[in-house]
UniProtKB/Swiss-Prot annotation:
Note: Plants contain two types of GAPDH: cytosolic forms which participate in glycolysis and chloroplast forms which participate in photosynthesis. All the forms are encoded by distinct genes.
Feature type site, description Activates thiol group during catalysis: H181
Organism: Dianthus caryophyllus
A GO CC term assigned to this protein in UniProt: cytosol
Annotated function: Key enzyme in glycolysis that catalyzes the first step of the pathway by converting D-glyceraldehyde 3-phosphate (G3P) into 3-phospho-D-glyceroyl phosphate. Essential for the maintenance of cellular ATP levels and carbohydrate metabolism.
Single GO biological process annotation from the record: glycolytic process
Protein's UniProt name: Glyceraldehyde-3-phosphate dehydrogenase, cytosolic
EC code: 1.2.1.12
Amino acid sequence: MAPIKIGINGFGRIGRLVARVILQREDCELVAVNDPFITTEYMTYMFKYDSVHGQWKHHDIKVKDEKTLLFGEKAVTVFGNRNPEEIPWGGTGADYVVESTGVFTDKDKAAAHLKGGAKKVIISAPSKDAPMFVVGVNEHEYKPELDIVSNASCTTNCLAPLAKVINDRFGIVEGLMTTVHSITATQKTVDGPSMKDWRGGRAASFNIIPSSTGAAKAVGKVLPSLNGKLTGMSFRVPTVDVSVVDLTVRIEKPATYEQVKAAIKEESEGKLKGILGYTEDDVVSTDFVGDNRSSIFDAKAGIALNDNFIKLVSWYDNEWGYSTRVVDLIAHIHKTCQ
C-alpha cells in the first residue's frame, strides 16, 4: 500500500515531533512543511537538535534549496505562507494536513487548508467546534465525510482511556482531575504580560502556577456518558516535559483498589495495549520521556479512601505521546476512508 502523504502547518514543538514520528513510520510519508517564521536552514537545526528528545540520528537532514529539505534522500517541500488558504498542499500530494500552529483551531479556520488541496485536516489541539477523537477511546466513531477533526489535547488523551476503563468496569458517579503539567511554549521565561491569564505570565521556571484546563470536560465530548461528570484544573510546574494526571472519582460499583488496579492492568494488556500503560515500579517523571503511550497508570501512586472513592495517577509524555497519537489518528482515518 502507498504511504499516507502528510503535510505539517507550524513547525513548533508538536509540528517537529509529529515530523519525527512520521519519518520513523513505514506507512506514512512527510511531503511538505509550512512555517512563515523560520528559514529552511533554521528548520534543519531545530529539527536536528532537541533539548528534551535528543539529537535526530535516523538520517541526515540538509537544505537542498530554499524550498526543499532532504531527509536522507527524501525531499520535503517547504512553504512560508501565513494564510492557510495560500499553501499549495495539493501540488505536493499532501492528502492530510496536521494543523499545529495553535492558531487555526476551529473548523472554519482549519478548512482553509482544503482550499490548497488537502483532503483532511487534523488539528493538534482541542477545538470548540471540530469533532474530537481520542485514539483508543472513540476513534471508531469517525465517519469518512468528516474532513476536519481534532486530536483533542495531550491531557485529554491521558485522561480519557483511564476514565473509560473505570467507567466501563465500575461506573463513574463524578470526579475531579488535576494535571501536574510541564511548561509549554506559551509560558514566560521571566515575569511578563499575560492579560488573559495573569498567573500564566509569571516565570515558568521558578513557579508552580495554577491554571485552567478544559481536558476533563472534553472527556465528556469523546465519552458522552461522562458528560457533566468530570471537571479539572492544572498546575504548571518547572519541568520541560512529561506530565501527570491525578483523577479522583466516586464509583458506582464498590471495588477495592486492588480490583481497580487489576482492571486497568487487564485493559492495558488487551484492547488498550500501546495506548494505556501500567507500572508498579517506583517511577518519576523523566522515566517517561519519549514514551509513546497516551497514559501510563502508576499503580503505587494511587490510593483509595474506601471502596467507592479512589485517586488514580497516570503519567504521559505530553509532547511525544501526543504527537504519536496525531499520526495514529491519521492512519485510522486513512484506513476508514479506503
